[in-house]
UniProtKB/Swiss-Prot annotation:
This is DDB1- and CUL4-associated factor 17. It comes from Rattus norvegicus (Rat). The gene is Dcaf17. GO terms for biological process: acrosome assembly; cell morphogenesis; protein ubiquitination; spermatogenesis. May function as a substrate receptor for CUL4-DDB1 E3 ubiquitin-protein ligase complex. InterPro entries: DCAF17. It is found in: Membrane; Nucleus, Nucleolus. One of its GO terms (cellular component) is Cul4-RING E3 ubiquitin ligase complex.
Amino acid sequence: MGRTRKANVCPRLSRRALGFYTRDAGVVQRTNLGILRALVCQESTKFKNVWTTHSKSPIAYERGRIYFDNYRCCVSSVASEPRKLYEMPKCSKSEKIEDALLWECPVGEILPDPSDYKSSLIALTAHNWLLRISATTGEILEKIYLASYCKFRYLSWDTPQEVIAVKSAQNKGSAAARQAGTQPPVLLYLAVFRVLPFSLVGILEINRKVFENVTDATLSHGILIVMYSSGLVRLYSFQAIIEQFMQQKLDLGCACSQGGTTGTVGEAPFGIPCNVKITDSPPPLFEVSSLENAFQIGGHPWHYIITPNKKKQKGVFHICALKDNSLAKNGIQEMECCSLESDWIYFHPDASGRIIHVGPNQVKVLKLSEVENNSSQHQISEDFVIWANREDRKENLITVTASGRVVKRNVNLLDDDPEQETFKVVDYEDELNLLSVVAVTQIDAEGKAHLDFHCNEYGTLLKSIPLVESWDVVCITTGTLSCKGFLYKRHLLGHVLVSPDSPVP
């Protein structure tokens, strides 16, 4: 394993008090986070359950705020005990919030309204309104009516904190049409906005006549990603599509005529017409075939991860260079495990270019580096591995032959055997630079879990925190570490455990 060194925060506190870091705000921030990490990970720090609540709807968490009742109620988890920030008035089912993103003030931009400098929740309602809500008071600051010709359902960042994409539900047509083998020409719509102040980029339709056999599409970092039933994934330049196929430029709040109807763009009942209609298939920037359209890009230099497009290849991952599609040395990664649930792989979110490969009993962190004496080729190697705490257990399988002879054979158990410690969640805490891992062991009818903090650089175990309550494996959704503690959430019950109750080391 890597180096282990117990950090003492007292010298850093003394230097901070003497003003050693006053000339550089970034150094102050990093110093404060280093102190916090030392407090969180020290052996004497104890975490306790300070607050419990119930929710019939899923619980969401963003930057120290916990959202209940479809984002209608917001609770701050920053204080020593969570407190309610606001609760919006009750609304009908058609007005509930379907999805939301937290927007935070950009640096260096002059905004038109003082309220724009405070965090906002960008929310999408069930009846196609896009709202900007104050993250501290719940007041609705802006509202845009999208359209009546489709049902918008999903929000995502195209460019984080700058451009959002609002995606509609897929148009599958009526049951009678499907039975007759006919499909509506438009699969879905993508509405794209620049945020603060809100401005419309355009609404794009994904047409089955242009993108034949298309099954889904999304937008990320200016790239339109289109997925096909054959497993093919194609990438297109969204900017080039806008320049070539935009029918008319639309501005929010301005008058517009469409199909004989006149109205104001972004106001009900007119909404926003679809103004980007692709008539010819644009040239793709890149295409690749992958099982279940699974495709990721990352690393330094750019590489991508796919699974070969054959069912028997499930669980096999190929890591290839984006520039020439060449397979990296040791680029075929297959975790030799026998389990009911598949392992998963993704580029590390810390922008180090590393790769995280998670299986039921191990977490591999892989690094991408140049091949010695060949700078044009790259190789995959292990940076470190986190292993589950398990016993080497085998069961005897007894078989009786036709002649009556008894044959005993050793049989290995499943790698995700619930009675063995199994990894369920792996998450990265960027501010404290910690890799957090949740491991679960099923004991009788209840599951016991613990949350481990590992050094993101070396994989060293820094802290293990048992979760006292039983853990229902079926209901696990995610684990999130905040600056003062952590939240683990379930569909019916959420617990927030915060504030180390121990002296400074």
